[in-house]
Amino acid sequence: MTEVKVAVTIAPEQELSQSTIDDLIQFQDSIDIIELRIDQWTNLNEIAIEKVVEDLQSLKLNKKLLVTYRTSNQGGLGDFGEDDYIQILRKIANCQNIDMLDIEFDQTRSLNILQELIELAHKNQVQVVLSHHNFKETPKLEALKHLFYKMQQLESDYIKVAVMPHGKQDVLNLLNAMSDTADVVSQHVVGIAMSKIGLISRTAQGVFGGSISYGCLDTPKAPGQIHVSTLKKQLSMYE
């Protein structure tokens, strides 16, 4: 069984609120990774990013920091076009005190550009979570396996696939594809079936070879997220 890290997703408005700071401190024992979502920011630039990163560093929580700009095409609030999206990823990869960067995998995006971004991040000792999100449906099992296969051809550190299930078979297909992929690739694998019906994919992530489970501090930032303290307890049942 794979060791699973708990990532807490926070989505502050330009700066950290006191309630977010208090919650991060209170529940720090349940957290391994802080995922900072920035796609909701109206004034997005590297100075604003670095300011929040510095504020997180000042808390001295000793957690890895993952920065994510989620585009609207993959369920986020980000409205950047292709060129602006690539540019902001380059800026994030060059920021100080960032440990991990989320890069979206899209079948229409140039693999050369994706590989260039991954190499830039690695040059700066930043790990890459190559992610793909489908908020509409869950592809068939073979399509899921092929998606994982295409993603693992790039040299990221993690490959993450999140889908929307409409029945128990969708959840089983996601877990099956994640498990089979985890058995044969060198990268860490993450598979999430969103919404309440897919909760087992978050709480039993490690049983099926997954390595990160995402939780929240207050309002879920994705369908099916649960509080990190509950998530940590659920994950510990499989240890």
From Swiss-Prot:
GO terms classed as biological process: 3,4-dihydroxybenzoate biosynthetic process; amino acid biosynthetic process; aromatic amino acid family biosynthetic process; chorismate biosynthetic process
Record's keyword terms, sorted: Amino-acid biosynthesis, Aromatic amino acid biosynthesis, Lyase, Schiff base
InterPro entries per record: Aldolase_TIM, DHquinase_I, Type-I_3-dehydroquinase
SUPFAM superfamilies in the record: Aldolase
Entry EC number(s): 4.2.1.10
GO molecular function, one term: 3-dehydroquinate dehydratase activity
Active site location: H133, K160
Highest taxon listed in the record's lineage: Bacteria
The UniProt record lists the keyword Lyase: yes
Pathway the protein contributes to: Metabolic intermediate biosynthesis; chorismate biosynthesis; chorismate from D-erythrose 4-phosphate and phosphoenolpyruvate: step 3/7
Enzyme class: lyase
Residues reported in the UniProt entry to bind 3-dehydroquinate: E35, L36, R37, R70, R202, Q225
Annotated catalysed reactions: 3-dehydroquinate = 3-dehydroshikimate + H2O
Function according to Swiss-Prot or TrEMBL: Involved in the third step of the chorismate pathway, which leads to the biosynthesis of aromatic amino acids. Catalyzes the cis-dehydration of 3-dehydroquinate (DHQ) and introduces the first double bond of the aromatic ring to yield 3-dehydroshikimate.
Subunit structure, interactors included: Homodimer.
Family: Belongs to the type-I 3-dehydroquinase family.
Protein name: 3-dehydroquinate dehydratase
Organism: Staphylococcus saprophyticus subsp. saprophyticus (strain ATCC 15305 / DSM 20229 / NCIMB 8711 / NCTC 7292 / S-41)
